[in-house]
């Protein structure tokens, strides 16, 4: 029986499958932080996608019915966005961003097209305002307006109402009603509801449905990544580090108000080339809370080029090719990319290769020269070169079609964090071209790209609200993004609920959240985040079950959550599992396993040396003096500690009592020192009678 319980963590249970799935997601999500730009000069955080031979098909050369046509003018090459969409995808009737930014146009234009449009706009604006003010009555009124708009068939209102229904805000929580409303909105073209539905299917392992939606959303994300006024958030900021506020990350996210930014700007104005280049990157990509501004980016890159900065030459070439902040001019793009390439800026070769594929800014198309330039870029580990060589071999453009070679190039680009390559590999997994059909992996990879869509800009507004002290609005926006499947938003919303539980910011079924509603909502969010690889979330879920916080005490479910965190190399979870084995709480009483977990904890985190040493001492005492008074005393400590802690907080830490205790301690110290002085003097004069003056 004991062995059976001990082996439980490795049994392929549904939770184990979820864990495996979301560990893959965590890996792929890191790639979403990479830039989608072709000749990208910014840093990319790589990750490793490891495939075995079994993942590849044996016959991967030649024609395939699912392969795209060999066309050099295909959309696969539109890295410089030849045609801009008629409308900014952010200004769809469903977007909240224009409602957050007073400078933006109304999502429905200057005048609402219908009464439902007017109700939706007024409702969402009132809801955001009520969340900021902590006004539950106004929030309920706003929700009623949104519901009225949803009844009128407005897809954005249906999507917002689905969010409120799923969270249990101003109405009983109902996942089935939320799903139905998201379905109505998605069928009407609402992309945010499609995100929510895709995530719902993904959690239920309904990969066929998830892949269909995520593929569409990933394509939309790639299309909009460079033409939207609000760039995708490629630096999701986690508000917390463990249980504490992540002050360093927050400090670096204050945009132009950040001290580091102001220092960089000052240095750039003083002629520092490195600072000019850095400032240009911040404006070009919209990093660290800085609003994207192509005009300022062009200004600083031009200044840097005047100082001889070769990296800025390459970026100027890209700016002219894209027409970002300037009139599109492929001749100028070719000039600057050529200058950069001569200065050994190898990613510029990738841009030149693109121009030769399309025949832009050059005499004519030249696929041979394009391939040579892509190869030079790839030889120097430029991910854009890998990607474009992959497209050449996948389609047989200027080379013999070879899917295996294409897959290898795409995988190298994926491991360098290239979003388009992630999209391509996802498509190969989806269609079973070159790689065995694997819808689970396709969903994972499509999801990581889809999360770069324009809807990700909500997290920018959530972060700005938090930094301004508008916790209510931050919670609402993070909760909205959590509904769309963003892990960072899920953990941020859960952390806010835990950290600011005493404040009136959580909207419940009727008025503000009760403590139980708040605990349950935070618990659900932590659980979703833990499914997506957040080890701290899994640890907190274990604590909730172990101590009965917001849920019924359940040692076995606590152990499952700790095992989930332990599988992600969390030292605290290892320590907790050791403690549970030592005391037989939810796990078999097994001192050998307890010691093993304690040892693992200190191996993973050397800072755990002291608590592990104390735990091992307790383990030795329990093993050698089982049933003794000392063991009973050790077992009673967890019950005594909260009482002592409460006494310290309520009595000792009270301002008045603390002053009295401090004065008393000072008095005792003075009396002690005085008595010691008297005794020392008496010892120095042994003939002096007792009581004589010193």
UniProtKB/Swiss-Prot annotation:
<feature type="compositionally biased region" description="Low complexity">
    <location>
        <begin position="89"/>
        <end position="109"/>
    </location>
</feature>
<feature type="repeat" description="Sel1-like 1">
    <location>
        <begin position="157"/>
        <end position="190"/>
    </location>
</feature>
<feature type="glycosylation site" description="N-linked (GlcNAc...) asparagine">
    <location>
        <position position="366"/>
    </location>
</feature>
<comment type="function">
    <text>Component of the endoplasmic reticulum (ER) quality control system called ER-associated degradation (ERAD) and involved in ubiquitin-dependent degradation of misfolded endoplasmic reticulum proteins. Functions as an ERAD substrate-recruiting factor that recognizes misfolded proteins for the HRD1 E3 ubiquitin ligase complex.</text>
</comment>
<keyword id="KW-0325">Glycoprotein</keyword>
<keyword id="KW-1133">Transmembrane helix</keyword>
<feature type="compositionally biased region" description="Acidic residues">
    <location>
        <begin position="72"/>
        <end position="85"/>
    </location>
</feature>
<feature type="repeat" description="Sel1-like 5">
    <location>
        <begin position="386"/>
        <end position="417"/>
    </location>
</feature>
<dbReference type="InterPro" id="IPR044623">
    <property type="entry name" value="HRD3"/>
</dbReference>
<dbReference type="InterPro" id="IPR011990">
    <property type="entry name" value="TPR-like_helical_dom_sf"/>
</dbReference>
<protein>
    <recommendedName>
        <fullName>ERAD-associated E3 ubiquitin-protein ligase component HRD3</fullName>
    </recommendedName>
</protein>
<comment type="similarity">
    <text>Belongs to the sel-1 family.</text>
</comment>
<keyword id="KW-0472">Membrane</keyword>
<keyword id="KW-0812">Transmembrane</keyword>
<keyword id="KW-0256">Endoplasmic reticulum</keyword>
<feature type="region of interest" description="Disordered">
    <location>
        <begin position="61"/>
        <end position="116"/>
    </location>
</feature>
<keyword id="KW-0677">Repeat</keyword>
<feature type="transmembrane region" description="Helical">
    <location>
        <begin position="651"/>
        <end position="671"/>
    </location>
</feature>
<feature type="repeat" description="Sel1-like 3">
    <location>
        <begin position="311"/>
        <end position="343"/>
    </location>
</feature>
<feature type="repeat" description="Sel1-like 8">
    <location>
        <begin position="571"/>
        <end position="602"/>
    </location>
</feature>
<feature type="repeat" description="Sel1-like 6">
    <location>
        <begin position="419"/>
        <end position="453"/>
    </location>
</feature>
<dbReference type="GO" id="GO:0005789">
    <property type="term" value="C:endoplasmic reticulum membrane"/>
</dbReference>
<feature type="glycosylation site" description="N-linked (GlcNAc...) asparagine">
    <location>
        <position position="329"/>
    </location>
</feature>
<dbReference type="InterPro" id="IPR006597">
    <property type="entry name" value="Sel1-like"/>
</dbReference>
<feature type="repeat" description="Sel1-like 7">
    <location>
        <begin position="537"/>
        <end position="568"/>
    </location>
</feature>
<feature type="signal peptide">
    <location>
        <begin position="1"/>
        <end position="43"/>
    </location>
</feature>
<dbReference type="Pfam" id="PF08238">
    <property type="entry name" value="Sel1"/>
</dbReference>
<dbReference type="GO" id="GO:0036503">
    <property type="term" value="P:ERAD pathway"/>
</dbReference>
<feature type="repeat" description="Sel1-like 4">
    <location>
        <begin position="348"/>
        <end position="380"/>
    </location>
</feature>
<keyword id="KW-0732">Signal</keyword>
<feature type="repeat" description="Sel1-like 2">
    <location>
        <begin position="275"/>
        <end position="309"/>
    </location>
</feature>
